[in-house]
Amino acid sequence: MCGVGKVYLDRTEERMYDGEFGETVQQSMEILVALGDIYGAERMVDISSAQVSGVSYKTIGDAGLEYLEDLRARGAGVKVASTLNPAGMDLQRWREMGFSEEFARRQIRIVEAYSAMDVMNTCTCTPYLIGNVPLRGSHVAWSESSAVSYANSVLGARTNREGGPGALAAAICGKTPEYGYHLQENRRATLRVDVECELSGSDYGALGYITGKIAGEGVPYFTFTGHPSADDLKALGAAMASSGAVALYHVDGVTPEYMEASPDEAGDSITVDAGDILEAREELSTTDDDPDLICLGCPHCSLDEIRRIASFLRKNKPACDLWVCTSAAIGSAASRMGYTDVIEAAGGMVVSDTCMVVAPVEDLGYEVLGVDSAKAANYVPGMCGLDAVYDDWMNLIRP
């Protein structure tokens, strides 16, 4: 073992750090060692997969594009299965969405740079729905906040909330520093949340919004009167990651590590009732005006969510434009099942690779977005400069 700063490296890691595997591996290992020093890691661990953010041209701009194309030119490549976060547009249907040629050209260059590094251009915030499904206890380096929450909490994998460059560096080296949620002692509950009312639909996002603001970077432990679905947990985790910085939570009797979470030792506890949920739902809306665009799929819709939307749209037409956001893989399955035809016959559009948060929706003339995602409601006013209306998707479609 060789010590570099506070982090000990094995012989292979030391060779990476010394440049024996090339400049880009060396640069990436330097990033990982620096992160390890900052956060007090003692060593590196192998990762089984990576999930890389910093994909939308809207968010990374020309500086990010140049950084990625420089890595590509220097022959960078990933060592583990790696998937991409959403881009700023549907890579196939961007013209139908109304985005400019210039934006599209630069967005495509970003995705091509990642593809050249062997990062799978899946462009989704739900990699666990399309095959990037780490085993319980395995170490990964994921960066999308809602995906990090799902991986840690629902799958029982181990990841910190990586920045885009850190996740890419981990993917290139196949390593990440062992600190934070990679360590068992940091995965115990710090806040007990007793939910005293029945929840459905966007109530889970409202609950996450409440909890994230209180928990901050802590680890909530929930007790429910009902049994949340996987899609409910997806919405809950995404909301907590946006209103706070929650990257791991436990649900009594549901999530894989709940028996090891030590909820009785949590330092704080809260109760949440129906009045709290109603107040949060009202707070998440910034206007009483009707939306001129409904955006569903933050995080990206599962196939079952699209099935239910299509079933509803057989008898109901949206009062305004409608986007149903998902991954290309789930979108393809929705097309095969006939769900896309139903949604688009009703006036909606199934869009892949992107979402309302990282797409330049503000350039399309919309003023009010209707969302059933607390994460989207939290981000849209700041990132898009638009008002948000928060409600169940059925209420948004049929006001």
From Swiss-Prot:
What general EC class does the enzyme of this chain belong to?
A: lyase
Where, by residue number, does [4Fe-4S] cluster bind? 125, 298, 355
Instruction: Provide this UniProt record's keywords sorted from A to Z.
Output: 4Fe-4S, Iron, Iron-sulfur, Isoprene biosynthesis, Lyase, Metal-binding
Required co-factors: [4Fe-4S] cluster
Molecular function GO labels: 4 iron, 4 sulfur cluster binding; lyase activity; metal ion binding
List of residues binding (R)-5-phosphomevalonate: 54-56, 85-86, 144-145, 375
Q: Which reaction does it catalyse?
A: (R)-5-phosphomevalonate = (2E)-3-methyl-5-phosphooxypent-2-enoate + H2O
Q: Pfam families, alphabetically?
A: AcnX
Give the metabolic or biological pathway. Answer: Isoprenoid biosynthesis; isopentenyl diphosphate biosynthesis via mevalonate pathway
Q: How is the cofactor bound?
A: Binds 1 [4Fe-4S] cluster per subunit.
Gene Ontology terms: biological process: isoprenoid biosynthetic process
EC number from the UniProt entry: 4.2.1.182
The record's PANTHER family line, in alphabetical order, gives: DUF521 DOMAIN PROTEIN (AFU_ORTHOLOGUE AFUA_6G00490) (PTHR36577:SF3)
Q: What does this protein do?
A: Component of a hydro-lyase that catalyzes the dehydration of mevalonate 5-phosphate (MVA5P) to form trans-anhydromevalonate 5-phosphate (tAHMP). Involved in the archaeal mevalonate (MVA) pathway, which provides fundamental precursors for isoprenoid biosynthesis, such as isopentenyl diphosphate (IPP) and dimethylallyl diphosphate (DMAPP).
Q: Which family does it belong to?
A: Belongs to the AcnX type II large subunit family.
> How the protein assembles, per its UniProt entry?
Heterodimer composed of a large subunit (PMDh-L) and a small subunit (PMDh-S).
Name of the molecule in the record: Phosphomevalonate dehydratase large subunit
Lineage of source species: Archaea, Methanobacteriati, Methanobacteriota, Methanomada group, Methanobacteria
